[in-house]
Swiss-Prot record:
It comes from Salmonella typhimurium (strain LT2 / SGSC1412 / ATCC 700720). Low-potential electron donor to a number of redox enzymes (Potential). Involved in the reactivation of inactive cob(II)alamin in methionine synthase. Residues 4-165 form the Flavodoxin-like domain. This is Flavodoxin 1. One of its GO terms (molecular function) is electron transfer activity. Keywords: Electron transport, Flavoprotein, FMN, Transport. Pfam families: Flavodoxin_1 (PF00258).
Amino acid sequence: MAITGIFFGSDTGNTENIAKMIQKQLGKDVADVHDIAKSSKEDLEGYDILLLGIPTWYYGEAQCDWDDFFPTLEEIDFNGKLVALFGCGDQEDYAEYFCDALGTIRDIIEPRGATIVGHWPTAGYHFEASKGLADDDHFVGLAIDEDRQPELTAERVEKWVKQVSAELHLDDILNA
């Protein structure tokens, strides 16, 4: 088993593709990818480092598999776990709810002890509001818009994975 668990929910395949891009950059020996629809509480508890991918649907709603998993997520003790979040949204058609699900999942795991890393700048995005903000200038995790800015996805993922790897000291962990 790898040291990092990447868990995603996806209806269209976009968030799944992002999860696989992240795994490819980190390496299969470092990160395992799991569909949250097929995952259990014990699956998440087996990792000290978690990357959680959650898309936002319509008017700020979480993807259905994550929505179904939230009660289980509320049972997990996240103390000692390092968590980075990533998610997809549409900043044009749903500008008032862009990547809201990042905030929804943050609001579940942070009070349960999760240490969240991987805040991402809001510069370059055009939206009106988001519950996924860490502060005025940062999302709580990587925000991806495959509908309006697909040409920026690969670069954003690459930069974010490097940032998260540094914040998590993955090189130190792997070389210990």
